[in-house]
Each structure stands twice: as structure tokens, then as C-alpha cells.
């Protein structure tokens, strides 16, 4: 019996937990292999009160130790995930940017005008397409749009921009703009003051001032400041590329417009030269006709006044002669016959 007690051992977890107790006297009875150690099916009672007589206690202690180890392993992982999780602080609200409700409406670019006009048409035509896909399709359509069709949107954008500049210039002279400017300056000062107080203690203000004055070339890489600086530069470059592309498209459209105008001007110049030549020929023919009429009607004085034509008065002479004949054709039959003879001689 003493050999059995000495040979039986507890699981490692149980032995570690009860190592401070009297572990030398603890034995486990009722195990399956103990039955084979006794012959005849007889067993002797164990009178030691420190013995563990139920395997459920061993299992319970082992489960508790396992759960404790798992909990200790999960806590660092949860804490690590909590530290990795960034973003806006819980319970903190984002402040809306200060907007001036009295300011004139900002102008829209030609691309935005095209998007606003075509978006509803495309959504009505294909309602199953999601919004991001519609935006992508409209972007491709704008890039493939001919410069002549883009010209309409760009011209509208230019007119809208001129309107905005005029209204903004007038608005900046009003009292409402001055009040809004003071509010914006006060808010910016308060924001800078709060940021300075939250980032650095009072005794580090001089060091912070020196840090702000340093050049962008002194920013250490792989830092939050460097990443923010890179993001700002990338955003600025994207905006510059976009503006450059718009100006190139506008320049190409203007170049085509200039070429078409130059061609039209050259054509008009040729037409003007031709018309001048034709007018010169007609003027010469008119002078020849006046001279012939003056010579032919020199012997035909006007009834009542006796006026005969000259090179300077041939036009008025012919008008008066026509008026006299049309007024009384029966009384001026002889005059009509004379005029017919003169005209027949001119045709020959």
C-alpha cells in the first residue's frame, strides 16, 4: 500500500497549484490501474484526511488552471488590438467647418457641370449600376469627349467663374464679410491655442517654436509628421496635374478655334478682293453709261424747265424725265417717242 501511494503522482498543473501544501501525502485512489494492483477484489481503507478521493476535484482544478492560462493569453492580444485600433476617440464629436452663408456660390468646373448633366440621364437609363461605377463611366466619357463638345462646358465654367469673382469682390466690401472674417480668425486662434496646450507642456513652448521654424528638409522620415507632409504634397500635385490637364485641353480647343478663325479670315479676305474687283468693273460700266446717256439726251430738254443733262446732273435728269412721262403719258407721247429713239440708238 505504501508503494502504491508513493508511486501515484498528480498531473503537473495540480502539482504546481498545490506545491505549497502538503503534497507529499496526497494520493489518488479509485483509479483503474489500482484495481489490477490488488488481488481478490479486496481494498483497504485510507485513513489520511488530506487525500483527494474524487477525480472531479482534479478535473475541476485542471479546468480552472487552463481557463486562467487562456485568459492571460487573450488579454495581451486584446490590449494589443485595442492599441492598434486608431481613429476618432469615442464620444468625441467632429466640429463642422465654419461656413459663410452670405458668401456667393462657388463656381463649378466644366467637368463637374458635365457630371451633373449626365449623371441623372445615366442613372435613369441604367438604374442597376452603383454610384461609383457611374462616376467611373462618366470620367471615361469625359476623357473621350471631343474638344468641341467640351468647349460648351468649359465656356460655362469660365462665365460662372467670372460671375463668382465679381460677386466675391462686391461681397468682400460688405459688413457681413468683415464679421465672418473676425469669427474665422478668432476660431483659428482658439484652435491653435488648444493644439499647443494639448501637445506640449508649458516649459516646452520654446522648443516647439524652434521645431516649427525648421525647414521641411529637416523632417525625419518614417514619422507622422513626414507622412502628413507627404500626403499634403501628393494632394497638391494631384490638384496641379488636374489643373494642368484642364489647361491643356482648353489650350487645344483654343488652338483649333484660332485655326478655324484664321481660315475664315483668309477666305473673307479673298472674297473682299473679288468684290472690290467686281465693284471697280461696275463703277467703270456705270461711268460709261452715264457718259452715253449724257451725250444721247443732250438734245432732249425737260418740258417746262428746258433742263439738259450733264455728267454731274444725269442721275437727277433721268429721274425727272421718268416722273414726267409716268405722270401724263398721253400728253407726252412725242417725248416718249424721242426717248425710245435715243434708247434704241444706245442698244445698237
From Swiss-Prot:
Cystine bridges: none
Feature: compositional bias, Basic and acidic residues: 72-82, 183-213
Highest taxon of the lineage: Eukaryota
Disordered, as annotated region: 1-114, 181-213
Localization per Swiss-Prot or TrEMBL: Nucleus
Main location (coarse class): nucleus
A Gene Ontology BP annotation from the UniProt entry: regulation of gene expression
Keyword Calcium tagged: no
Coiled-coil ranges (or none): 230-274
PROSITE patterns for the chain: HMG_BOX_2 (PS50118)
DNA-binding region in chain numbering: 104-172
Polar residues biased stretches: 34-47, 56-71
Residue stretches of biased makeup (Basic residues): 83-97
CC terms in the record's Gene Ontology section: nucleus
GO MF entries: DNA binding
Presence of the UniProt keyword Coiled coil in the record: yes
Keywords noted in UniProt: Coiled coil, DNA-binding, Nucleus, Transcription, Transcription regulation
Function: Plays a role in neuronal differentiation.
Name used for this protein in its record: High mobility group protein 20A
Gene it is expressed from: HMG20A
